[in-house]
Curated annotation (Swiss-Prot):
Gene name in the database record: PFS2
Protein name as annotated: Polyadenylation factor subunit 2
Cellular component aspect of the GO annotation: chromatin; mRNA cleavage and polyadenylation specificity factor complex
Pfam families with a match to the protein in the record: WD40 (PF00400)
Organism: Candida glabrata (strain ATCC 2001 / BCRC 20586 / JCM 3761 / NBRC 0622 / NRRL Y-65 / CBS 138) (Yeast)
BP term (GO), one: co-transcriptional mRNA 3'-end processing, cleavage and polyadenylation pathway
Region (Disordered): 406-425, 430-455
Transmembrane segments: none
Function according to Swiss-Prot or TrEMBL: Required for 3'-end cleavage and polyadenylation of pre-mRNAs. Also involved in chromosome segregation where it has a role in chromosome attachment to the mitotic spindle.
Keywords: Chromosome partition, mRNA processing, Nucleus, Repeat, WD repeat
PANTHER family named among the record's database cross-references: PRE-MRNA 3' END PROCESSING PROTEIN WDR33, WD40 REPEAT PROTEIN
InterPro entries: G-protein_beta_WD-40_rep, Pfs2-like, WD40/YVTN_repeat-like_dom_sf, WD40_repeat_dom_sf, WD40_rpt
Location relative to the cell: Nucleus
Highest taxon above the source species: Eukaryota
Amino acid sequence: MDQSAAVEGVPQKKYLTLRRSVDVSSSYNRLYYLKKHGLSLPPIEPETSFTANIMPPDAYKRNDRIVNLPTKFTHLSSNKVKHVIPAIQWSPEGRRLIVATFSGEFSLWNGSSFTFETIMQAHDTSVTTMKYSHAGDWMISGDADGTIKIWQPNFNMVKELDRIHTEGIRDVAFSNNDSKFVTCSDDNILKIWNFSNGQQERVLSGHHWDVRSCDWHPELGLIVSGSKDNLVKLWDPRSGQCVSTLLKFKHTVLKTRFQPTKGNLLAAISKDKSCRVFDLRASMNELMCVRDEVDFMELEWSTINESMFTVGCYDGSLKHFDLGQDTEKPIHIIPFAHEKCISAIAYNPVGHILATAAKDRTIRFWTRARPVDPNAFDDPTYNNKKMTGWFFGINNDINAVREKSEYGAAPPPASTAFPQQTQYNNNISRVPEIKEPTPTTDKEQRTSILPGLSI
């Protein structure tokens, strides 16, 4: 018998491919146990084994909120036929990410394993905006033709409002009780609609150029809009009149967002390279103004921490801000998050994952950092050492294709291991600067070297 033929007949052993998965259910179980028995949160010390002590984002709403910064690159996803991605939106329970493309398609991605689930043709033209209702029962999408479509959670379209604007729709927002919604468009006006019957109720006119953004206050009867005429206007939805105008910006206002948790603050970004936060309780007093060398393109508040928000920039970088820690500069920067301009940002409702999309036609998922991560600053999103297939990287272990570096590919050798500490460091000041660590002494090795978790 031919030996080679016998070998060919034997089925070859197949090796499993590891796929990263993010699941917070076990940490929620532990948090409920601690609350039930009146126990305090476990400490997080600078040692790898303390990763198990990281609780869900809800546990760090006020104290140690820096733990919730999504600074670690976890996964990159893209469609086979790649298009620019104007909008992304998490489902209300946070299990799936809905991605809208320039071709008018919806694609669904799993929120824990980041696998592709399905794709469908939703609009005839580019989908420009999407928004779920507060109750999570409906989703509204708008396109470049000025058409609005209303969807059920199973993506069954129940109503279409054809060409309600003469130009493309830029943004949409639900009222706090989901009974009405507002749309804004490049035709210089905003419109308020009754959600039950789809009838137009008010026309908000006052801008002199394209209206690029709108938002409805989470508690009050108040609408904010930002326009290409450099103005930010506040509207009364009952009378349809403008109640206040902010003249702080010198160029197109790209995004205006109320603070979703309490509604006390209003954040806005503009093409004049500035990001400003206003306090509604103090006659719209300017609480923060940050300028940069590149344009701010996208803005999104954290769904858990009331003082934190994230801004996406024209050069593809991500910048995290915390008003309770620093009002003059971002507390953390991911300099090479994308290759091109960031076009959409969305926080998972649970708060443990941040999804971003850009004109490089990819979706990237970011999670919270881990204590003493040896790959912290050696990631290509920080040092820009990107090559073919870099996004598989060391995070996927078996199928790693990125070359190993001195500090980033594996844990430090035994001689330089981080010793365990018995006391919890409560003096968390701020995130360290974005630079690749070069530990030289034992004292320096004890300091934090991971992005987003200064412990």
